[in-house]
Amino acid sequence: MTYEPVSLATALASFSQVWSPRIVTTVNDYDVRVAKVEGEHLWHVHDDTDEFFLVLAGELHIALREEAGERTVRLPRGSVFTVPRGTEHKPYAPVPTEILLLEPTGTSTVGDRHEEVPDHVDATTGHALG
């Protein structure tokens, strides 16, 4: 990894796949990833880590299954949200959306436990830019 400025717009323009994040940089032992998303992801859980979302463009909804029941958070452009570790969640983008994620290096996009992975979701720990 080189330590040079990275344009998020350029990074996002470098790929077209949805639900297939690219690693733009690392901070300590965390990846900073960008992704294009649209439609549904899948229900999944990260047992040992929180998951941070920043909506750069579009709108992201995250369905959550919590002790008190199910709820959905709506994140318009410019919003952030952290899904706590151990919380089952399912992201959904009703329109083409661009997001930034912060999670420990090596964290799978489908978590530690998940339902069947649909063809349009890339089960990965992130791809290098370029």
List the model feature ranges, each with a label.
Residues 66-85:
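Short acidic-glycine-tyrosine-enriched beta hairpin
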Residues 31, 40, 52, 59-61, ...:
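Structural motif
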Residues 36-37, 46-66, 102:
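Short, conserved beta-strand element in jelly-roll/cupin
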Residues 43-45, 50-55, 72-73, 90-91:
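His/acidic/aromatic-lined binding-pocket segments of jelly-roll/cupin-type domains
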Residues 2-12, 25, 94-130:
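Double-stranded beta-helix
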Residues 42, 79-90, 97-99, 107:
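Histidine-centered metal-chelating micro-motifs
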Residues 8-43, 49:
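A short glycine-rich, His/Asp/Glu-containing loop-to-beta-strand
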